């Protein structure tokens, strides 16, 4: 992901076809170690593609990825059962609280890893 981001920054900066050295400068400016093999692979894969096409492809891939949530549902179902004889309003408040906490998760995506 870091190599794609650096590639896009280079293109936005005016380089139509950025070279390894261009991306190395961008990545080293923020303290990221560069794997030359991966960098070369990314440049080969992205060469000749427009930014709009790359973003479109990325959105399609992200929309097809499953997003978790199965564990949170199971935990929410277990809470009312554990509170046998408890107040239903209290259980609903707990359930809503659990849902809002899970919204803050990053879904396993790391921007620069």
UniProtKB/Swiss-Prot annotation:
Residues annotated as signal peptide: none
GO process annotations (BP): cytoplasmic translation; cytoplasmic translational elongation
Sites bearing Phosphoserine, chain numbering: 100, 102
Region (Disordered) location: 66-113
Gene Ontology cellular component annotations, sorted alphabetically: cytosolic large ribosomal subunit; cytosolic ribosome
InterPro entries: P1/P2_N_sf (IPR038716), Ribosomal_P1/P2 (IPR027534), Ribosomal_P2 (IPR044076)
Amino acid composition bias (Low complexity), ranges on this chain: 73-85
Record keyword Zinc present: no
GO molecular function term, any single one: structural constituent of ribosome
Basic and acidic residues bias: start-end ranges: 86-99
Keywords from the UniProt entry: Phosphoprotein, Ribonucleoprotein, Ribosomal protein
The protein's assembly and partners: P1 and P2 exist as dimers at the large ribosomal subunit.
Function: Plays an important role in the elongation step of protein synthesis.
Similarity section: Belongs to the eukaryotic ribosomal protein P1/P2 family.
Protein name: Large ribosomal subunit protein P2
Gene designation per UniProt: RpLP2
């Amino acid at each position: 992901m870091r190599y794609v981001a650096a590639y896009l920054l280079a293109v936005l900066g005016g380089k139509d076809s950025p070279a390894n050295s261009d991306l190395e400068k961008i990545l080293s400016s923020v303290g990221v170690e560069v794997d030359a093999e991966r960098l070369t692979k990314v440049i080969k894969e992205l060469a000749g593609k427009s930014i709009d096409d790359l973003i479109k492809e990325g959105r399609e891939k992200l929309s097809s990825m499953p997003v978790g949530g199965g564990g949170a549902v199971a935990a929410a179902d277990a809470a009312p059962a554990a509170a046998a004889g408890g107040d239903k309003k209290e259980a609903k408040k707990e359930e809503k609280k659990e849902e809002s906490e899970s919204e803050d998760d990053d879904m396993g995506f790391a921007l620069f890893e």
